[in-house]
């Protein structure tokens, strides 16, 4: 199922060393989903993905959450976090400077605006 979704079915017999970066990323993501986990912890899951695969990945993450699961992921693309996440944590220079429900953290701003505000001021908005 997942190999078909990510268009890897025809390459499954090939050596992984022959895969492109994007294909390796897809394979890693498939391996994360294949056992139908209730919790996924992903580091930069969209890096190396083409737009179609990124959309598939977002839909799979939403589907997992809709079924009662949870996804924790890191990203440097704040727009992705803002669109996908119910809860968010902002880390600046290794320090947790904001966390909570997305709407509580950002208010009427964008996540990017909040990030730069706390990064410039080097403050913790949870205090």
Q: How would you name each of these model-derived features?
A:
Residues 36:
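Conserved catalytic motifs of ABC-family nucleotide-binding domains
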Residues 40-44:
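Catalytic Walker B motif of ABC-type/P-loop ATPase nucleotide-binding domains
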Residues 55-67:
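Helical segment within the ABC ATPase nucleotide-binding domain
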Residues 81-83:
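A short, surface-exposed alpha-helical micro-motif characterized by mixed small hydrophobic
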Residues 99-100:
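ABC ATPase "signature
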């Amino acid at each position: 199922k997942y190999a078909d979704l990510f268009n890897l079915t025809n390459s499954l017999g090939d050596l992984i060393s022959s895969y492109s970066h994007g294909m390796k990323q897809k394979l890693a993501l498939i391996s994360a989903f294949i056992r139908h986990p209730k919790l996924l912890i992903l580091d930069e899951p969209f890096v190396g993905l083409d737009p179609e695969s990124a959309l598939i990945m977002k839909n799979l993450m939403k589907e997992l959450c809709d079924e009662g699961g949870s996804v924790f992921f890191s990203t440097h693309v704040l727009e992705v976090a803002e669109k996908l996440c119910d809860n968010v944590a902002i880390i600046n220079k290794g320090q947790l400077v904001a966390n909570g429900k997305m709407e509580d953290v950002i208010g009427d701003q964008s996540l990017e605006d909040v990030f730069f505000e706390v990064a410039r001021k080097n403050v913790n908005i949870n205090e």
